[in-house]
Amino acid sequence: MDNLNINLINDDEHPIPSQDLLLKCLQLVADKHHISHAEVNLNIVSNDEIQQINKQFRNKDKPTNIISFEFEKPQGLPDDIANDFLGDIVIAPAVLENEAKEQNKELNDHWQHIFIHGLLHLLGYDHQDDQEAEVMENLEIQLLAQLGIANPYIEQENQNGR
């Protein structure tokens, strides 16, 4: 894991899982995509901060659990520098805690799911339509199973009739 790095920014010291747990998620995603070097910025923020970011970048004036910003290489930046950096992930722990309680999920399991979800966004996955969502969700389910975490969409599928 020496070639994988998470730059953690948690200025307000919000409670989060161990960095080892998050690195395990990054390792799984990197292995699945044959990535040997990867770097990610992980910003841990309050509900107010993520709401501001969500409004500014997604025109949604409400808190969300995660927002990912895929890295776009500036012109002239050498490939050996740019290729390792995947992008920035912003997570609001209070939103994750509420979701985990509402969905009767273990908090660390939910953290791992949402972090993997964000990492996949950095690699270009999306869920703008049903087909994209199915591909992304299936990959998340597969990766989470490797961590011993049950399919997080089962309850939602039953509620949505999917």
From Swiss-Prot:
Belongs to the endoribonuclease YbeY family. This is Endoribonuclease YbeY. InterPro entries: MetalPrtase_cat_dom_sf_prd (IPR023091), YbeY (IPR002036), YbeY_CS (IPR020549). The keyword Transmembrane does not apply. It is found in: Cytoplasm. It is an enzyme of class 3 (hydrolase). GO terms for molecular function: metalloendopeptidase activity; RNA endonuclease activity; zinc ion binding. It comes from Francisella tularensis subsp. novicida (strain U112). GO terms for biological process: rRNA processing.
